[in-house]
Amino acid sequence: MSPDTAADAAADPALQSSVLTVSLGERSYPIHIGPGLLGRAGALIAPLLRKPRVFVVTDATVAALHLDPLLASLGAAGIAHDHVVLPAGEATKSFSQLEELLDLLLAARFERSTTLLALGGGVIGDLVGFAAAILLRGVDFIQIPTTLLAQVDSSVGGKTGINTAYGKNLVGAFHQPRLVLADTTVLDTLPRRELLAGYGEVVKYGVIDDPAFFDWLEEHGSALIAGDGGARIHAVLTACRAKARVVAEDEREGGRRALLNLGHTFGHALEAETGFGPTLLHGEAVALGMVMALDLSVRLGLCPPADAARLRAHLDHVGLPTDPRRLEGAPAWNAERLLAAMDHDKKVEDGKVTFVLARGIGRSLLWREADTASVLATLRAAVAP
């Protein structure tokens, strides 16, 4: 990899950690990936601060596991800190919680020179990033993702936001962090279901444009899920390298970055139908959405049926859902309602949904010519009783 590529990696053999750079000119920032980084957080964060003060935002689940080690590391580095613990769960990505967080920060006399620090999964990262984008017209923030999903996807790239009654992530802003700190050791504390949900986003990178990575996942995915530290580091590093490259080329999703939404158009509709509740985690929705996207690709004559079957087989093998009807607590799915929900997708232009489809594993593309009949047939095949 040449020095001027979007994501330059420098390995530190002694610490088994790596550093990537998201190259965005003056707004470039590092991604640290490896084990034990939470204990070094203060030393890694300190050089990037305008002044040695941060405000940590986390949720109740993460606080019980990781807040004290982080605060100790910040204190050891001479960084003053406050913190707030929010409720855990997707419901926290809401207007009401955003307002509550902003009011709390303003009441605490938060200053522009203080840095917000998001410690948690995608919900906390998205909420805190959006708060940072609009508080005092923009303040610095740092991502410390504690889930596999957040480490490989949501913490990188500057997408922030909240959910609304009309759909997921429909209100938000592009606001890049100053640093992403992905401690792969914290993944050991994740429940298996959460880890699997994150794996759905990992698989996505192989399907988009990296067939060799998909091959690797077929061989090593089970070990990654079972706790193989080396496999986890490799997967996070590969995913972050891919995303960093795409973000550097297309920060605001005007073109190629939209490919990273593979599985999300169908997946977000499924999530909306479940009320963004515990019935369906985001990564599970992405897995289901990828299966449906490749099914639509087959129906449109774009993708060999064998590739769609290969994706489904791998997701089944590791334990991710591939059939919405088999979800515990699933609603009475309705294909027409799901189709209507897709009309609120962020990728709608001139009344048409832009789908991320595939010509095969590792060969994704944007497609605006999907006819309603084919989309509806895909939905019915997935959810009809």
Swiss-Prot record:
Residues binding NAD(+), per UniProt: 122-126, 146-147, 159, 168
Q: Where are its TM segments located?
A: none
Predominant cellular place of this UniProt entry's protein: cytoplasm
Q: Name one GO molecular function term.
A: nucleotide binding
Explain how, and how many, cofactor molecules are bound: Binds 1 divalent metal cation per subunit. Can use either Co(2+) or Zn(2+).
- The enzyme's main class, written as a single word, is lyase
Q: Which cofactor does it need?
A: Co(2+); Zn(2+); NAD(+)
Name the InterPro entries on file: Dehydroquinate_synthase (IPR050071), DHQ_synth_AroB (IPR016037), DHQ_synth_fam (IPR030963), DHQS/DOIS_N (IPR030960), DHQS_C (IPR056179)
Q: Single GO cellular component annotation? A: cytoplasm
Q: What does this protein do?
A: Catalyzes the conversion of 3-deoxy-D-arabino-heptulosonate 7-phosphate (DAHP) to dehydroquinate (DHQ).
What is the designated name of this protein? 3-dehydroquinate synthase
Supply the source organism for this entry. Answer: Rhodospirillum rubrum (strain ATCC 11170 / ATH 1.1.1 / DSM 467 / LMG 4362 / NCIMB 8255 / S1)
Upper classification of the source organism reads: Bacteria, Pseudomonadati, Pseudomonadota, Alphaproteobacteria, Rhodospirillales
